UniProtKB/Swiss-Prot annotation:
Lineage: Eukaryota, Metazoa, Chordata, Craniata, Vertebrata
BP-aspect Gene Ontology terms: mitochondrial electron transport, ubiquinol to cytochrome c
Family: Belongs to the cytochrome b family.
GO molecular function: metal ion binding; ubiquinol-cytochrome-c reductase activity
Binding-site residues for heme b b562, renumbered to this chain: 83, 182
Any GO CC annotation of this UniProt entry: mitochondrial inner membrane
Subunit structure: The cytochrome bc1 complex contains 11 subunits: 3 respiratory subunits (MT-CYB, CYC1 and UQCRFS1), 2 core proteins (UQCRC1 and UQCRC2) and 6 low-molecular weight proteins (UQCRH/QCR6, UQCRB/QCR7, UQCRQ/QCR8, UQCR10/QCR9, UQCR11/QCR10 and a cleavage product of UQCRFS1). This cytochrome bc1 complex then forms a dimer.
Keyword Mitochondrion: yes
Residues that, per the record, bind a ubiquinone: 201
The protein's name in its UniProt record: Cytochrome b
Extra information: Heme 1 (or BL or b562) is low-potential and absorbs at about 562 nm, and heme 2 (or BH or b566) is high-potential and absorbs at about 566 nm.
C-alpha cells in the first residue's frame, strides 16, 4: 500500500513541498532564512493575537492598555517583548534572505523574486503600522512624519493624507484603522509567502555555485529539516537573549512617553530596520525627490534581473563583484547609522554620499564589474 502522505490530496501537497521536495545537495546555511522567516511570521501572528486580546485602539487608552499588558496580564511582558523583538529578528532574517538572493543570483527566478519584493513592502507596511499602536511619542510623530510624505504626491497629495488620517491630523480614526490593517496584513503576508513558495517550487532552489543541480538532488527531509531546526534554535536563542536580558535595546526610549501632539521629540526616527531608507529619504533636500528615492531604494531590487550582465549566475567565482557586494553591505550599515543621527554636519554629507553610493553600486558598478569579469575569463 502506498503511504498516505503520497496519496491523500492535502498530505500530498505538504509532502511535495516540505518532505520529498528535491533540493540541491550543496545549499549552505544562507538557504536557512526562508524557514526562519516562516517561524518569525508564525511567532508574530501568535504573539500579536494574544496582544490584540488586551489592546484597545483608542487614543485615550492605547498607551495604558500596553502598560496593562506588561504589568497585569499573566506573562504579558514576555508576549509584548517577543512581539517587539520578534519584528527585529524578522527584519534581520529578511535582509539576510534578500542579500543571499543578490549574492547568489537568485533574482533570475523573476516570479519568485518579484513576489518577494511585494512581500518585503507588505512586511514593512505592517511593521510601520504596528509601531504606531503603543501610542508613545515616537509612535505618534513617526506616524505623522511618514504619512505626511504622501502629501508630496502632486495634486492629490494633501487629500490623500487626510483620507489616510481620517481627519486633519493623526488621531483616533488613524489609530483604529492602523490597528485593523496591522491585524489583517500578516495573513496577507502568509498568503503571499505561499505564492512565493509555489513559484520557487516551479523552478527548484538555486545553489551556491549557480550551476543547474537537477542531476544531484536530495530530499528536503531529513537532510535540510534537521539543518533548519539548528537555524531555528539559534534564532530562538538570540531572540530570547534579547527579550530576557535587554528587551528595550532596539527600541526608542521616547516611546515610553505617552503621545503628545503639542511636544515634538528632538529626533524623530523610525525603528532601526527602516533607518537605511530613512537616511536615503533625508539625504535629498526636495520632498518629492526624497519620497521617490525612499521608494526606489527598495524598488531597485525589481530591476536587478535586468542589470545582470555576468555570464555566471552567482558571485561565488566573481571576486570583483564580491568586493562590491560587501561594499554595498557596509554602505547599508553606514546608512542605518546615519538614519539614527541628527540632521547636522557631518552626518548630512555622509548620508548623501552613502545614498549616492548605494544606487551607484547596484545600477552601475556591479553591472560594469560583471562585464570586466566576463572579459577576464574570455567568455
Amino acid at each position: 500500500m502506498t503511504n498516505i502522505r503520497k496519496t491523500h490530496p492535502l498530505m500530498k501537497i505538504i509532502n511535495n513541498s516540505f518532505i520529498d521536495l528535491p533540493a540541491p545537495s550543496n545549499i549552505s546555511a544562507w538557504w536557512n532564512f526562508g524557514s526562519l522567516l516562516v517561524i518569525c511570521l508564525i511567532l508574530q501572528i501568535l504573539t500579536g493575537l494574544f496582544l490584540a486580546m488586551h489592546y484597545t485602539s483608542d487614543t485615550i487608552t492605547a498607551f495604558s492598555s500596553v502598560t496593562h499588558i506588561c504589568r497585569d496580564v499573566n506573562y504579558g511582558w514576555i508576549i509584548r517583548y517577543l512581539h517587539a523583538n520578534g519584528a527585529s529578528m524578522f527584519f534581520i532574517c529578511l535582509y539576510m534572505h534578500v542579500g543571499r538572493g543578490l549574492y547568489y543570483g537568485s533574482y533570475t527566478f523573476t516570479e519568485t523574486w518579484n513576489i518577494g519584493i511585494i512581500l518585503l513592502f507588505t512586511v514593512m507596511a505592517t511593521a510601520f503600522m504596528g509601531y504606531v499602536l503603543p501610542w508613545g511619542q515616537m509612535s505618534f510623530w513617526g506616524a505623522t512624519v511618514i504619512t505626511n510624505l504622501l502629501s508630496a504626491i502632486p495634486y492629490i497629495g494633501t487629500d490623500l493624507v487626510q483620507w489616510i488620517w481620517g481627519g486633519f491630523s493623526v488621531d483616533k480614526a488613524t489609530l483604529t484603522r492602523f490597528f485593523a490593517f496591522h491585524f489583517i496584513l500578516p495573513f496577507v503576508v502568509l498568503a503571499l509567502a505561499a505564492v512565493h513558495l509555489l513559484f520557487l517550487h516551479e523552478t527548484g532552489s538555486n545553489n551556491p555555485t549557480g550551476i543547474v543541480s537537477d542531476s544531484d538532488k536530495i530530499p528536503l527531509h531529513p537532510y535540510y529539516t534537521i539543518k533548519d531546526i539548528l537555524g531555528a534554535l539559534l534564532l530562538i536563542l538570540v531572540l530570547m537573549l534579547l527579550v530576557l536580558f535587554s528587551p528595550d535595546l532596539l527600541g526608542d526610549p521616547d516611546n515610553y512617553i505617552p503621545a503628545n501632539p503639542l511636544s515634538t521629540p528632538p529626533h524623530i526616527k523610525p525603528e532601526w530596520y527602516f533607518l537605511f531608507a530613512y537616511a536615503i529619504l533625508r539625504s535629498i533636500p526636495n520632498k518629492l525627490g526624497g519620497v521617490l528615492a525612499l521608494v526606489l531604494s527598495i524598488l531597485i531590487l525589481a530591476i536587478t534581473p535586468l542589470l545582470h550582465t555576468s555570464k555566471q549566475r552567482g558571485m561565488m567565482f566573481r571576486p570583483i563583484s564580491q568586493c562590491l557586494f560587501w561594499l554595498l553591505v557596509a554602505d547599508l550599515l553606514t546608512l542605518t547609522w546615519i538614519g539614527g543621527q541628527p540632521v547636522e554636519h557631518p552626518y548630512i554629507i555622509i548620508g548623501q554620499l552613502a545614498s549616492v553610493l548605494y544606487f551607484m553600486i547596484l545600477l552601475v558598478l556591479i553591472p560594469i564589474a560583471s562585464i570586466i569579469e566576463n572579459n577576464i575569463l574570455k567568455w
